[in-house]
């Protein structure tokens, strides 16, 4: 696990956006795993700006979103398909036919989950998976007690997650309690994982994910198993890490190493 601690949410978004942009420059036909919620919005704004400035293209990109509410059509303003269209897809040069969000209105949700897994595999797997983290350590809609090798499936949301997401729904509006989500095993299959977290409300979850035991009680702790997981967090989200100064030291040494390697490559 690479732990990157930055000053604030703006720096976190900038770092994450640059990582994705560099991925697309290396591999223009990358397969991106994308996330919703408040955390990635600033990152998406930076991707839109870079695309509109001609700094990066999404023409060859295929994308798969982590999750979707079960029971909402893609045209519903609170659906994650609507979120992705309005926050990113409609503003960049991506082929919308190559953007995938689990179908919240599927007649047969079980079959839809199996088909989603097959689509990811047919695309060659996910090159970089973007994640947020819930206060209870959930990633996607993999709530505590989720199997660490689980695949895309229907999940019941915890009351804590329902309450966290209630701010996105109008008073009295129907709020789903079920979702379709990539499983933890599906997420771990990605070649690289990028998790962003900001704010003191995420500090306990970050501590459990990074320094706690590998446990289904904190789904994000499964990232300890990943060969290339990068956690980019601000000072507030890092505030409860016992070894945060050590993580800063490791990252500083890593940056020096990368600079040396770049200099050697430039001198070839």
UniProtKB/Swiss-Prot annotation:
Residues the record marks as active site: 67, 136, 138, 143
GO biological process, one term: N-acetylneuraminate catabolic process
EC number(s) from the headed UniProt entry: 3.5.99.6
UniProt GO MF annotations: glucosamine-6-phosphate deaminase activity; identical protein binding
Catalytic activity reported: alpha-D-glucosamine 6-phosphate + H2O = beta-D-fructose 6-phosphate + NH4(+)
Domain of life according to the entry: Bacteria
Keywords, ordered alphabetically: Carbohydrate metabolism, Hydrolase
GO cellular component terms, A-Z: cytoplasm
UniProt xrefs under InterPro entries: Glc/Gal-6P_isomerase (IPR006148), Glucosamine6P_isomerase (IPR004547), Glucosamine6P_isomerase_CS (IPR018321), NagB/RpiA_transferase-like (IPR037171)
Pathway assigned to this chain's UniProt record: Amino-sugar metabolism; N-acetylneuraminate degradation; D-fructose 6-phosphate from N-acetylneuraminate: step 5/5
Gene3D superfamilies: 3.40.50.1360
Pfam families on file: Glucosamine_iso (PF01182)
Subunit and partners: Homohexamer.
Purpose: Catalyzes the reversible isomerization-deamination of glucosamine 6-phosphate (GlcN6P) to form fructose 6-phosphate (Fru6P) and ammonium ion.
NCBIfam families, alphabetized: nagB, PRK00443.1-4
Entries under PANTHER family matching the protein: GLUCOSAMINE-6-PHOSPHATE ISOMERASE
Stated name of the protein: Glucosamine-6-phosphate deaminase
UniProt organism field: Shewanella loihica (strain ATCC BAA-1088 / PV-4)
